Swiss-Prot record:
One of its GO terms (molecular function) is rRNA (uridine-C5-)-methyltransferase activity. The active site is at 334 (nucleophile). The gene is rlmC. It comes from Escherichia coli (strain SMS-3-5 / SECEC). Transmembrane segments: none annotated. One of its GO terms (biological process) is rRNA base methylation. Disulfide bonds: none annotated. SUPFAM superfamilies: S-adenosyl-L-methionine-dependent methyltransferases (SSF53335). This is 23S rRNA (uracil(747)-C(5))-methyltransferase RlmC. PANTHER family: RNA M5U METHYLTRANSFERASE (PTHR11061), TRNA (URACIL(54)-C(5))-METHYLTRANSFERASE (PTHR11061:SF30).
Length: 375
């Protein structure tokens, strides 16, 4: 992938950009094999990759510069701003949105937040695109609601320029810290969720729900999990740390009883909407802490699927699963180091199958799917 920003030394986010994709995959596979070296692995599946550029469905832009000439991108460690509108990880459809947002920021009088001076209002622009219909969700992250009336007044101009903006919100983040969003979300459109579709499964994206940033690879990850589950004798399963329900909704059948657990209520609202559309009555989603939910249960299903954040599932859940011993565990991880640590805490299980998914090209990061079977 060619990147003018990297070549000019202005952005170093894609640290592996000079390596061809096959070399990147080899290095990631070697890293994963090294982390799992202590465990016998029955089957190593071929790694899955997607496009090497234009694959991201989301942009998180720090807003800097002046209200007349805003910059959308990032701040270097020394506070110097960098405009990243030309980043080749973004699809071509993002360029006209960035181009319209710059004059809009001036029209609405949204003064960019100055980190050094702790002044200004507009902190971030968050943009997400649906692959299914090209609809977009735009979020303005503001320090306060001071400019809200001005933004509302100027909004019709932006909506006229960009009819693809289906969901528009303001998020209030009052704290002087590098935190992407606050708790308060104010909807400026009637529509509150973005419709997405992977492998004929309807998914919904709401402002404060996590969603994978590489749809081409994420859809293959979900389809693979579905294939693995279909090969197992399973009538009942849990989907822990389920997010908007991507795994559970793919794995569910009219015959499988499935419970999805996720702490974020916004994500659970998305999952419930999808389940209703699919007409799956034996599928239920609840907004709870996954570890607390599981460890309070007196019995476990045949299969527990976990998709934890980077920190892994942790010792309390590992201990519970070791004691209760479900026949199968499918572990989806964005941090193979913590996954390996967790597997070490599950000595009663062997690794049946492992597959690497290159969700984050040009970086050392990757996603991995592992099937564990009770010995």
């Amino acid at each position: 992938m060619q990147c003018a920003l990297y070549d000019a030394g202005r952005c170093r986010s894609c640290q592996w950009i000079t390596q061809p994709i096959p070399e990147q995959l080899s290095a990631k596979t070697a890293d994963l094999k090294n982390l799992l070296a202590d465990f016998p692995v029955e089957e190593w599946c071929a790694p899955v990759s997607g496009p090497e550029q234009g694959f991201r469905n989301k942009a998180k832009m720090v807003v800097s510069g002046s209200v007349e000439k805003p910059l959308l991108g990032m701040l270097h460690r020394d506070g110097t701003p960098e405009d990243l509108c030309d980043c080749p990880l973004y699809p071509a459809s993002f360029a006209p949105v960035f181009a319209a947002l710059k004059p809009f920021i001036a029209r609405a009088g949204l003064t960019p937040y100055n980190v050094a001076r702790k002044r200004g209002e507009l902190k971030y622009i968050l943009l997400t695109e649906s692959q299914s219909d090209g609809g977009m969700m735009l979020r303005f992250v503001l320090r306060s609601d001071t400019k809200l009336a001005q933004l509302r007044k100027a909004l019709p101009w932006l909506q006229e320029q960009l009819p693809q903006l289906k969901v528009i919100t303001v998020n209030i983040q009052p704290v002087h810290m590098a935190i992407m969003e606050g708790e308060t979300e104010i909807y400026l459109t009637e529509q509150q969720a973005l419709a997405e579709r992977f492998n004929d499964v309807p998914l919904w994206i709401r402002p404060q729900s996590f969603f994978q940033t590489n749809p081409a690879v994420a859809s293959q990850l979900y389809a693979t999990a579905r294939d693995w589950v279909r090969q197992l004798p399973v009538n009942h399963m849990w989907d822990l740390f389920c997010g908007v329900g991507g795994f559970g909704l793919h794995c569910a059948t009219p015959d499988i009883q499935l419970t999805g657990i996720e702490i974020a209520p916004e994500a659970i609202a998305c999952a419930k909407q999808s389940a209703a559309e699919l007409g799956l009555t034996r599928l239920q989603f609840q907004a709870l802490d996954s570890t607390q939910f599981a460890t309070a249960q007196g019995e476990v299903p045949e299969l527990v699927l976990v998709n934890p954040p980077r920190r892994g599932i942790g010792i309390p859940l590992c201990d519970y699963l070791s004691t209760m011993a479900p026949r199968f565990i499918i572990y989806s991880s964005c941090n193979a180091q913590t996954m390996a640590k967790d597997i070490r805490e599950l000595p009663g299980y062997r690794i049946e199958r492992v597959q690497l998914f290159d969700m984050f090209p040009h970086t050392a990061h990757y996603e991995v799917l592992t099937l564990l079977v009770k010995q």
